């Protein structure tokens, strides 16, 4: 790596309370990331474990309008707890925006994914950050540079290809919401038949 080279970022988002050696999705994600880094020396990894990190639950007082967190002056009028929550939401959103490649590792739960991932997505879906409102239209803002999302999902059984649009609602949602924000390249890595305890 040449001195002065600006490093790109891979943001690894894990969504499983199990330790890595007991989680199929996290084990596969780690192998994928290690291989990726071997081939892409200009990348560094930043990790966030949604079961260990604090992900705020959104409250009405955090917003000045739809999908728009209160500005810094108004945030100072909130109590200390709420100010910290607003700061955390901003930090999560800024961290997401700064990445070039995203890897999400999650199990399929109830045809979807664990709840912390939805709470995280709610935090990063911000007006003038990842999307913008233009009249009655919503425009993506994450199409400003090449970005790629890799969604690694484990499931206990095998989901037949023809039933995936019906049964794989979590995968479909993640693909749709990422493209909604402007992340055009979406790759899926499905780890099926891990056993019904996975």
Located regions from the model:
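Residues at the starts of beta-strands that form the adenosine-phosphate
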Residues: 9, 44, 147-148, 185
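N-terminal beta1-alpha1-beta2 submodule of the flavodoxin-like/Rossmannoid cofactor-binding fold
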Residues: 2-106, 111-115, 119
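Glycine-rich phosphate/pyrophosphate-binding loop and the adjoining helix
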Residues: 34-37, 160-198
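Short glycine/proline-enriched loop/turn "hinge" motifs that connect secondary-structure elements
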Residues: 2-4, 140-145, 180-182
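Cofactor-binding loop segments of dinucleotide-utilizing enzymes, especially the Rossmann-like FAD-
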Residues: 15, 154, 191
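Helix-loop-strand module that forms the ligand-binding subsite of alpha/beta enzymes
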Residues: 82-166, 171
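Flexible, glycine-rich phosphate/dinucleotide-binding loops
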Residues: 19, 54, 158, 195-197
């Amino acid at each position: 790596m040449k001195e002065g080279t600006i490093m790109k970022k891979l943001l690894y988002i894990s969504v499983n309370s199990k330790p890595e050696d007991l989680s199929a999705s996290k084990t596969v994600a780690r192998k994928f990331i290690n291989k990726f880094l071997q081939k892409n020396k200009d990348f560094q990894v930043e990790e966030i474990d949604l079961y260990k990190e604090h992900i705020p639950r959104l409250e009405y007082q955090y917003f000045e309008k739809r999908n728009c967190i209160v500005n810094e002056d108004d945030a100072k009028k909130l109590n200390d707890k709420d100010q910290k929550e607003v700061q955390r939401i901003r930090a999560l959103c800024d961290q997401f925006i700064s990445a070039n490649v995203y890897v999400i590792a999650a199990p399929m739960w109830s045809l979807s994914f664990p709840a912390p991932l939805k709470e995280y997505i709610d935090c990063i879906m911000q007006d003038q950050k990842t999307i913008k409102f233009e009249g009655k239209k919503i425009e993506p803002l994450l199409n400003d540079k090449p970005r790629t999302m890799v969604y690694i999902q484990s499931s206990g059984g095998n989901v037949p290809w023809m039933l995936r649009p019906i049964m794989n609602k979590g995968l479909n949602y993640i693909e749709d919401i990422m493209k909604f924000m402007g992340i055009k390249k979406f790759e899926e890595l499905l780890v099926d038949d891990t056993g019904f305890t996975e």
